[in-house]
Swiss-Prot record:
Comment on bound cofactor: Binds 2 Zn(2+) ions per monomer.
Name of protein: Chaperone protein DnaJ
Residues reported to bind Zn(2+) 1: C152, C155, C205, C208
Species of origin: Cupriavidus pinatubonensis (strain JMP 134 / LMG 1197) (Cupriavidus necator (strain JMP 134))
Source lineage: Bacteria, Pseudomonadati, Pseudomonadota, Betaproteobacteria, Burkholderiales
Matching CDD domains: DnaJ, DnaJ_C
GO terms of biological process kind: chaperone cofactor-dependent protein refolding; DNA replication; protein refolding; response to heat
Superkingdom to which the source organism belongs: Bacteria
The J domain, residue ranges: 5-70
Task of the protein: Participates actively in the response to hyperosmotic and heat shock by preventing the aggregation of stress-denatured proteins and by disaggregating proteins, also in an autonomous, DnaK-independent fashion. Unfolded proteins bind initially to DnaJ; upon interaction with the DnaJ-bound protein, DnaK hydrolyzes its bound ATP, resulting in the formation of a stable complex. GrpE releases ADP from DnaK; ATP binding to DnaK triggers the release of the substrate protein, thus completing the reaction cycle.
Compartments in which it is found: Cytoplasm
Assigned protein family: Belongs to the DnaJ family.
């Protein structure tokens, strides 16, 4: 099945700003998050689709490639992976030479010097981390294990079986590029024999298969700043895939996702919570104690508080990761109807109800307003 357009997935236009893309992603991620839809396979698939779209459109380089070439511009299958014979340059390596010759520039961040093989920056790596709302609010330090490439201990990193040597590629003579004529056009392409390395290994290392490196894992310390929001990324420079032909390594991006909280719902730096209160407290008023991410807080509830009333507690939200200022906590109170009443309690409520209605409508203004609106239906 063909992939949907990434802009369509997020519900934004192709000219959407970074903030608009992030806002749309945050809204959809909260809607389809697996923690909120534990038994929905459809929601899980939509969450993955939304996450993939955001990963592409929030990265300036990937977004530019997608805008110009569509899904082909960001499809990792367009070039071989690390372990295969096609190298690991990705889309830029596959098309950089052709478009570079036509437009007079090198695409994809490659560099060439002295006619030798072209060097490419290593691919970036992504790591998804899930943390609690408390960890997001207060900051967090975590250890993660990520892919790492070490020099092969069998061939000491040169890719050749011990006792043999690495030779200059006989096809491109070490340049890593070959010139191909097609009609009136002459274009440079990556050498099909050495795949751009400029080298030829007659007897590849039996352990690393000529790559010179072995994939392993390493542990990194990640510092998550206080106030980080859903979908934000932390960059660890130089911890991506290794470069090709002497190019610099890529970066590691740690994408942070925040678990759904049983009490609070986050909106930027603000927090929202639903709080049930008794009928007596709503009618008579009183002080309420409410939880916050930094302990308990007390606020006054005035007399005659109606269900659905919202109270704002300034500075009780999350300290902004960029602004440094805390958001607010919004407490939405819901008047709870008592259940499992005894007969004596029911009699008391009936007496109370009669006494309230004997005084006219001044005790129930919303009820009277509603009756005034619908009385024509009963006449």
């Amino acid at each position: 099945m063909a992939k949907r357009d990434y802009y369509e997935v997020l519900g934004v236009g192709k000219n959407a700003s970074d903030d608009e893309i992030k806002k749309a992603y945050r809204k959809l991620a909260m809607k389809y998050h697996p923690d909120r839809n534990p038994d929905s396979k459809e929601s899980e698939e939509k969450f993955k689709e939304v996450k993939e779209a955001y990963e592409m459109l929030s990265d300036a380089e990937k977004k530019a490639a997608y805008d110009q070439y569509g899904h082909a511009g960001v499809d990792p299958n367009m070039a071989g992976g690390f372990g295969g014979g096609q190298g690991y340059g990705g889309f830029a390596e596959a098309f950089g030479d052709i478009f570079g010759d036509i437009f007079g520039q090198q695409a994809g961040g490659g560099r060439r010097g002295g006619g030798g093989p072209q060097a490419y920056r290593g691919a970036d790596l992504r790591y998804s981390m899930e943390i609690s709302l408390e960890q997001a609010a207060h900051g967090h330090e975590a250890q993660i294990r990520v892919p790492h490439w070490d020099d092969c201990d069998h061939c000491h990193g040169n890719g050749a079986e011990p006792g043999s040597s690495v030779e200059t590629c006989p096809t491109c003579h070490g340049a890593g590029q070959v010139r191909v004529s097609q009609g009136f056009f002459s274009m440079q392409q990556t050498c099909p024999k050495c795949h751009g390395s400029g080298k030829f290994i007659p007897k590849p290392c039996t352990k690393c298969h000529g790559q010179g490196k072995l994939k392993s894992q390493k542990t990194l310390e990640v510092k998550i700043p206080a106030g980080i929001d859903e979908g934000m990324r932390i960059r660890s420079s130089g911890n991506g895939e290794p470069g090709i032909n002497g190019g610099p390594p890529g970066d590691l991006y740690v994408e942070v996702h925040i678990k759904a909280h049983p009490v609070f719902e986050r909106d930027g730096d603000d927090l929202h919570c639903q709080m049930p209160i008794s009928f007596a407290t709503a009618a008579l008023g009183g002080d309420l104690e409410v939880p916050t991410l930094n302990g308990k807080a007390t606020f006054p509830v005035p007399e005659a508080t109606q269900s659905g009333k919202t109270f704002r507690l300034r500075g009780k939200g999350i300290k902004g990761v960029r602004s440094g200022y805390p958001g607010d906590l919004y407490v939405h109170v819901n008047v709870e109807t008592p259940v499992k009443l005894t007969e004596a309690q029911k009699d008391m409520l009936r007496q109370f109800d009669r006494s309230v209605h004997e005084g006219g409508s001044r005790h129930s203004p919303q009820e009277q307003s509603w009756l005034d609106k619908v009385k024509s239906f009963f006449s």
